[in-house]
Regions:
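Short, amphipathic alpha-helical "recognition" segments used to contact nucleic acids or chromatin
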Residues: 1-18
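Short alpha-helical "recognition helix" segments of helix-turn-helix
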Residues: 23-24
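Residues in the recognition helix of alpha-helical DNA-binding motifs
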Residues: 37
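DNA major-groove recognition helices of helix-turn-helix
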Residues: 40-41
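Short Lys/Arg-enriched helix C-cap and helix-to-coil transition segments
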Residues: 44-50
Length: 50
């Protein structure tokens, strides 16, 4: 499994998702995760990365 380092996080409550940009250590490939749901009541989030 690849190890990712988090470099930037963008939180968008209006659209209820968290956009995360990072890179894979092994191959230094640019990746972007946008499938993160936000719980409006608790302001917490859960990732649904594949």
């Amino acid at each position: 499994m690849s190890v990712y380092k988090l470099i930037e996080v963008y939180l968008d409550y209006r659209n209820n998702y968290l956009s995360v940009q990072g890179y894979a250590d092994k191959n230094e490939l640019s990746v972007e995760f946008t499938e993160v749901l936000i719980d409006e009541a608790t302001r917490t989030y859960k990732s649904i990365y594949g």
